[in-house]
Each structure stands twice: as structure tokens, then as C-alpha cells.
């Protein structure tokens, strides 16, 4: 059978597009700030080298949290935190959060809960956004999004460059933030075959 968020008999929390746009201007590089503000969720950095972070729901280890992108698993178990660094807020329409066991629907990786990242889709009104952000922790984020729907075709294009320099504010020899460069380019094509049929 199908396994859609709409058919799950449990509470689903939403982070709306308005909130994503607001908080995304503060931290365009990832969605950790947004998730940290949700009750019962903690994002914990798991690697000083790559900057990967795990999502802990209700105190359980990050390997028990399942990350989905448009309803499909991104990474499972210990690698789930990689999805945080590959999904900047500018590319998202909303985020759905389920706390508690959904393992019967999504496997053993969803014992603590799941986070479903919903991508933007093109609309008839053209959307063009550009974000440039610098941080006191030696970080730089540049990202852009374009989306538009025509009669039978639509497209979205997301591109980003994230740069972080090693930052040691206490001069202890250990960096508070790792050094990395990240490039993202994510084009999508949508075909509207009929009024109720869409292919992407």
C-alpha cells in the first residue's frame, strides 16, 4: 500500500514556508536552526571535519531518526545527518515532523520519528530569490532559486555555494566550526500531462 504523510494516524508538525523564508535569511546554509526551535528536537554536530549533524528526537540517538525528501528516504541511520547539509531552506516549501515511532511505515530508522523535507514546486507567478549571508564565525553563504510554471512545462533551479573557514575563537587549537566548501546545483523539470497528472 501507499505510505503518505496524509494517511498517517498521528500528529504531524509543520514548519511553514513563511517561517522557512524568515529563518532562511538568517542561516541560508542549512535547516538546523529551524529544527532546533521545534520542541523535543536537538541537532547535534557529529563530525568536526565535515560538519555533519544528527537529529535527535525525544532524546533518542540520531540513528533512529529518518530523514525524507519529498517522501523518499535521503539517508538512513548514522548517515542521516548528511541530509541537513544538502537541503538549504531556500529550496523548501515546508517541513513535516513526526515524533514517535513510525517504524512500521518507514523501517527501523524511524523509531524516534521522521523529518520530511518538501521541495518547492513551480507556480505560474515567477519566483526569483537570491540570498547572500556572512557570519561572525567566518561563514559565507550564497544561494539562488528560480521557479516558474508555463502551460505544460515548469522548472525550478536551485544553486548554492557555502564556504566556512576554520574558526577557533578561544585559541585552544580546536576549531568550533570546521572548514569546508560546498557547491549545490539542483535543476528540476515538471511536465503537466493532464489537469491531474504531473511528472517530474
Residue ranges and their predicted role:
Residues 1-22, 62:
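Short, acidic, small-residue-rich periplasmic hinge/interaction motif at the N-terminus
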Residues 35, 95-96, 115-117:
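Non-catalytic regulatory/gating segments with a bias toward low-complexity or hydrophobic composition
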Residues 1, 100, 118, 131-137, ...:
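Outer-membrane beta-barrel pore domains and translocons
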Residues 49, 107, 135-138, 177-181, ...:
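Short sequence motifs at beta-strands and strand-loop junctions characteristic
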Residues 116, 123-125, 145-200:
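Periplasmic-side early beta-strands and strand-to-turn transitions of outer-membrane beta-barrels
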Residues 26-27, 41-51, 72, 107-111:
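Short, glycine-/polar-rich solvent-exposed loops and beta-turns at beta-strand/coil boundaries
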